[in-house]
Amino acid sequence: MQRREFSVSAASLAAAAFGASALPIRAQAQAKGCQNGSDYLTIAKPAPTEAPAGQIEVVEFFWYNCPHCNAFEPMFDAWTKKMPKDVHARRTPVAFRPDFEPQQRLYFVLESLGKVDELHKKVFNAIHVERQQLATADQIAAWADKQGIPKAKFLELYNSFSVSTKARKSTQLQDAYAVDGVPALGINGRYFTSGTQAKTPERSLQVTDYLIEQSRQAMSAMAKPGKS
């Protein structure tokens, strides 16, 4: 099944409109049902996860320049604040082309400095509200300098082995999930959902709740005596 993202895809960066949902997350997921192959996809070869033992991982794939990622970010952020304690959520920036890499590295520099909470939303705002160009290392470093991160320090981290490794692993994870558009969600290395499957960004989180429960049940079954 070919996936075409509701927002920005690797094949096309055209924008598309999306609707809203008024039903509670679990209620709508259960009411409409979630079907493999339509509402979500099962990954043939499980993708690697970084969640602590016993936790279920949810990965948000995004790109700072994507307008729909900008719109989805508050939804995902609100969702993470209400997620169950056995769920571990993280973000990973995609790089469909080489020119995506500067913003991919930007995220990991912020992560290395412990400034994601402070500056992640400000990056989106700079691009989509202030219309700043943050496409190259120099442009991004100049912006970071205005946020209190000295340009030299930013570029040192930007070009560091640590950030290079994180960027490479991020792209590998993107490929493992066969992500071809953003925003999208990977669940516990086994499932993938997005606007294409779920039809709206809100419902992609509803489907994610359903897949978390599926993962929880599978983990519980594996933990029973005699299972391996």
List each model region and its residues:
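Sec/Tat-exported extracytoplasmic proteins
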Residues: 62-65, 80-83, 110-114, 123, ...
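Extracytoplasmic thiol/disulfide redox context detector
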Residues: 2-98, 213-228
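C-terminal cap of thioredoxin/glutaredoxin-like
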Residues: 5, 146-228
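Structural microenvironment flanking redox-active thiols in thiol-disulfide oxidoreductases
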Residues: 82-144
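Solvent-exposed loop/turn segments at secondary-structure junctions
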Residues: 65-68, 95-99, 126-129, 162-163, ...
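Extracytoplasmic/secreted proteins, especially bacterial periplasmic and envelope-associated proteins
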Residues: 57-60, 71, 75-78, 101-105, ...
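Polar helix-capping/helix-linker motif
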Residues: 31, 136, 159-160
